[in-house]
Structures are given as structure tokens and as C-alpha cells.
């Protein structure tokens, strides 16, 4: 029998991840600038958010439909059929949407909330560009996403081992968001594949974020921790490193340590 082996790389998908500032404005700018008239899927964490986002996009002139498990079977089927058969339809969905959906010309996948894991992210973004043409996987994330997901995990029915595994997966997803190196390389390495250092088709390759060598700053901070007796919090250590002659710093005599003011 013949075996077909496929890797995890989807070279036609451009991966882009950015922090939430004004997510609705960021979304509308992305759609109007790059994907006006294209079919796509927008993933949200809650059912309520899918409906609110779909309604808002309709007001902005987009053909957007909600999809989640709380809708009636008839409405889910109707929205799904419109997405599959018509051009330029956007589905705003929870993760309930996508399994078994094979629409080759999906031009973008948007995540308005952080996925639970790299596995989920890869599976959901993989629904874009199945025709081999260029597609975009675009995500905005924020600290509130992480807090919300951790609360959901802690409140789930799983045992402690399951919850710990869920937290590890979430941490890996957050790590993918915060790296400054190639996202495609990180994705492929996560799944055990070798990959070149740069793909040339993700945000960190196309617009490398500014970086700096924090070695010296870390050494100064650790030295300050040691010289102040390893018993003070971050705010106090910042005062010492910044050379602030506060009442507490003076009373402890830490204006005399060698690390006083070296972080100015």
C-alpha cells in the first residue's frame, strides 16, 4: 500500500500575532485593508461574543454570521451552508465550528481570543488556504485571555493531572505569542519537525521586533537582590536600583550599597 506523509508546514499561511489594544478597531482595519470581500472564520471564546461580533460586523457592512452550539440546529445548518456555498461570507464562531468543514478558499482565520493550546491554534488556522493560495492567520491576545482561560481550566471537571496538562499547553501557546523569532519555526518544532531559522512569511520574519541584550540588567538586578539581603519585593528593589532616596531605603542603609542607583 502507498503511504502519504505530510508535514506540519503550511507555507502559504502567513502567521501574525499582536497584542490587544482596541480589538474591534484592529479587526476592522485588518479586514478592510487586506481581506475585503474574502471568506474567513473569526474565532471567539464565548457564544455571546460570537453573536455580538457578528452583529457588529454586519453593521460595518460585512456579510457575517454567528455559529455556536447554542444556536438551533436549523440556524447552524443554514449559516454553515451559506458559508460553504456563497462567496465572501464570514463566520464568527466558537470552536464548535470547523470540524468537517472543507472550504478551500478561506482566505483568513482570526482569533479574537487566545486559543487553549498550540494544537488548537494549529488545527483552527489550518482551515485557511486549503487551495494553496496565500492566506492569513491573524490573532490578537491579551492578559485577560490568559486569566479567563486559567479560571476555566481551574473550574473544569478534570482531575489535577489533567488541569496541570491544560496549564502547560496554555503556557506553550502564550510562549508562541511572545517569541521574537520565527513563528513557523516555533510551530514546526513544537510538533517535532526541523525548520529553518526564518520562513519569510510570518510577522516576526517580515517585521522583526526590536530586541535588546538583558544580560547586564539581569546581573544588576540579581546583585541588588543579594546586597539587600534577599528579602525585599520588586517595587523596593526598583527604588534601590533607580537611586531613589526614600525613607525606607535610607532607614535600611541601602543607599550605601554598591547597587544603589546603577539602574538609572
Predicted features and spans:
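Proline-centered turn/helix-capping motifs that create local helix->coil transitions or kinks
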Residues: 133, 145-146, 178-182, 194-197, ...
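Short helix-to-turn junction characteristic of helix-turn-helix DNA-binding domains
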Residues: 31, 83, 177, 225-229
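C-terminal accessory regions
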Residues: 165-196
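Short acidic/histidine-centered micro-motifs embedded in hydrophobic/aromatic stretches
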Residues: 140-144, 179, 190-194, 205, ...
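Accessory DNA-binding and partner-docking regions appended to nucleic-acid-acting proteins
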Residues: 165-167, 196-264
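Helicase motor core with emphasis on the C-terminal RecA-like subdomain
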Residues: 1-160, 165-168, 195, 203-204
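Pre-recognition alpha-helix immediately N-terminal to the DNA-recognition helix
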Residues: 26, 172, 220-223
